[in-house]
């Protein structure tokens, strides 16, 4: 691809991402499906803006590579060891059963046993990129279904290696001593990567970090990820597996969080490019010619994989509320199927139209998953939210709550318990289905759903409630809910959780008067107790705490308009800090002159 064509393609990709994703979000179909549809639109079977799909698809696989590196960073070896049973138990069972059933279905058509076997293995693989993206969107990462889903995906990545080695054997290509020698060299090189990564990479990053130049650290992070991917591809192994191992080797290092920050922007963009490329690769000509056969194949693929996954979830004693999510999020074909099927076609294991038919089936199955997860969300919402409620109230029973609490983590639980202890009618909205089912078993009135959806807020009674308390973990979700409430429920009093000063500034700018900085309040309380242990009277310590809170809030409001100015902001912060100290000292001196009858028993 020429430089001008490459630049044009880059601009086009960014344009469709900027346009397609917000539209998809507005339609409620999810970002992944938006990317896929955008890819179809600009690909060779759509408007034809992009022709060289294979080159772009290969490049866009780097999105999966970056994703696996970040996942590796979040898993230390000890945590990975605890997952060994689910990886090699449930993961192996999923691949084995799915291969047997799907391969058997292919064999009943015009596939030979060799092509049916490799076809079954390829169709058994799920899309790591899509599944992990959807798990994050649905809040499944820390749930039982999310942990087990990750274990299955990891085993699938490992299974690609022997599957690729199996293809020449199925093709009848005989190996010689040289083949075994090359395999031995690959194993030795792989072990060398493990040892080198364990003992050399951390000192290298320590040396780079000492320079204090952030750009060099980012370059080193990219070098590590891309170098690991290239090394594994040279060995004929999975690029994603190589970067996953590199991430695990650095999971316990002091540079873990800095590496995540450096890699995250590249991961997001390249994952979007990957999904766009998958959409572009969809052969609409084959689809039009064999539409009935392909639609049946997609239905069988999704149904068989979902049934296998649901069965394994039940055997594994997963909560009933999570089985559907687990089965749905992994029910599609995956990106490694493209690699396996292309390799099989090069060895003539797959013949004629078998390759394009399988590729179209896998691509369409990936497009069904976001829609399937939306259907599952609605099923779960009805099952766990509505109890003898008419159909026109689709999510939650509306009995005019006084307060709606969004989020039922530790922060939201404390608030909810305080409100219920004071006989307040509350409705709690939570999108982690495992938390919903667990808390409902204890008698809490918790409902499943994503509070960034306007319809859910309506059915929860936001138009009749007096207040809404937003305790989301993600600041972007908090701001989206704030905007929805201000636009559609202007009489609703908004109270919000702020993770820090940045989120507090954003809430102030939107007009939210009532918010709490989670670390600030607990730090102030501990600071008050520290003053008491240093000899200050409890009453004076409490007054000092109150003065500091009031003055800090004043400084927060004064600095709000200057949030974006670097040099001026630093100067103003220093000035405000000095002013805060002066005012604080004057007020505390006045306070000490006041008589106090409070002793330590009143603390």
Curated annotation (Swiss-Prot):
Keyword Transit peptide set for record: no
Entry keyword annotation includes Iron: no
Localization per record: Cell inner membrane
Superkingdom of source: Bacteria
GO molecular function, one term: glutathione-regulated potassium exporter activity
SUPFAM superfamilies per the UniProt record, alphabetical: NAD(P)-binding Rossmann-fold domains
Membrane-topology descriptor: Multi-pass membrane protein
PROSITE patterns recorded: RCK_N
GO CC, alphabetical: plasma membrane
Domain spans labelled RCK N-terminal: 400-521
Keywords of the record: Antiport, Cell inner membrane, Cell membrane, Ion transport, Membrane, Potassium, Potassium transport, Transmembrane, Transmembrane helix, Transport
Family note: Belongs to the monovalent cation:proton antiporter 2 (CPA2) transporter (TC 2.A.37) family. KefB subfamily.
NCBIfam families, sorted: 2a37, PRK03659.1
Database matches in PANTHER family: K(+) EFFLUX ANTIPORTER 3, CHLOROPLASTIC
Function, in words: Pore-forming subunit of a potassium efflux system that confers protection against electrophiles. Catalyzes K(+)/H(+) antiport.
Protein name: Glutathione-regulated potassium-efflux system protein KefB
Organism per entry: Pectobacterium carotovorum subsp. carotovorum (strain PC1)
């Amino acid at each position: 691809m020429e430089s001008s064509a490459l630049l044009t393609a880059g601009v086009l990709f960014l344009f469709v991402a900027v346009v397609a994703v917000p539209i998809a979000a507005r339609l409620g179909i999810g970002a992944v499906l938006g990317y896929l549809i955008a890819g179809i639109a600009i690909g060779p079977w759509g408007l034809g803006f992009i022709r060289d799909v294979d080159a772009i698809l290969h490049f866009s696989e780097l999105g999966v590579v970056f994703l696996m590196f970040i996942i590796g960073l979040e898993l230390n070896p000890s945590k990975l060891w605890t997952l060994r049973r689910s990886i090699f138990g449930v993961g192996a069972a999923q691949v084995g059963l799915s291969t047997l059933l799907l391969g058997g279905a292919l064999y009943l058509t015009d596939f030979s046993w060799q092509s049916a076997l490799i076809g079954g293995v390829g169709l058994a693989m799920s899309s790591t990129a899509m599944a992990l993206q959807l798990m994050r969107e649905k809040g499944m990462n820390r749930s039982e279904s999310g942990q087990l889903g990750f274990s299955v995906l990891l085993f699938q990545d490992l299974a690609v290696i022997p599957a690729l080695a199996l293809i020449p054997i199925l093709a009848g290509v005989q190996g010689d001593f040289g083949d075994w020698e090359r395999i031995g060299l690959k194993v030795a090189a792989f072990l060398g990567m493990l040892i080198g990564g364990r003992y050399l990479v951390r000192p290298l990053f320590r040396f780079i970090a000492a320079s204090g130049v952030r750009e060099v650290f980012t370059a080193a992070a990219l070098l590590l990820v891309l170098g690991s991917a290239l090394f594994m591809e040279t060995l004929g192994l999975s690029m994603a597996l190589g970067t996953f191992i590199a991430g695990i080797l650095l999971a316990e290092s002091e540079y873990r969080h800095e590496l995540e920050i450096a890699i995250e922007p590249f991961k997001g963009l390249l994952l979007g490019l990957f999904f766009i490329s998958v959409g572009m690769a969809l052969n609409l000509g084959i689809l039009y010619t064999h539409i009935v056969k392909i639609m049946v194949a997609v239905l069988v693929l999704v149904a068989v994989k979902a049934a296998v996954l649901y069965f394994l979830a039940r055997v594994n004693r997963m909560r009933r509320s999570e089985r559907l999510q687990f089965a749905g999020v992994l029910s599609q074909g995956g990106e490694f199927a493209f690699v396996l099927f292309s390799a099989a076609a090069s060895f003539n294991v797959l013949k004629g139209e078998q390759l394009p038919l399988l590729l179209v089936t896998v691509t369409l199955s990936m497009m069904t998953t976001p829609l399937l997860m939306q259907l599952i969300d609605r099923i779960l919402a009805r099952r766990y939210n509505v109890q003898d409620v008419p159909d026109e109230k689709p999510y939650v029973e509306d009995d005019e709550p006084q307060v709606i609490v969004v989020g039922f983590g530790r922060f939201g639980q404390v608030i909810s318990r305080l409100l219920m202890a004071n006989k307040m009618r509350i409705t709690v909205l939570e999108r982690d289905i495992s938390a919903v089912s667990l808390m409902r078993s204890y008698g809490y009135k918790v409902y499943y759903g994503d509070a960034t959806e306007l319809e859910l807020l309506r059915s929860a009674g936001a138009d009749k409630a007096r207040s809404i308390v937003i305790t989301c973990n993600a600041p972007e979700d908090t701001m989206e809910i704030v905007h929805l409430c201000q636009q559609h429920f202007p009489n609703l009093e908004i109270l919000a959780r702020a993770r820090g000063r940045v989120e507090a500034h954003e809430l102030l700018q939107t007009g939210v008067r009532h918010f709490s900085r989670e670390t600030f309040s607990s730090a102030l309380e501990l600071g008050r107790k520290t003053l008491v242990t240093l000899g200050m009277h409890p009453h004076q310590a409490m007054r000092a705490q109150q003065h500091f809170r009031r003055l800090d809030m004043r400084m927060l409001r004064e600095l709000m308009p200057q949030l974006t100015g670097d040099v001026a902001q630093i100067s103003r912060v220093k000035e405000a800090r000095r002013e805060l100290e002066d005012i604080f000292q004057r007020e505390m001196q006045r306070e000490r002159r006041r008589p106090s009858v409070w002793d330590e028993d009143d603390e």
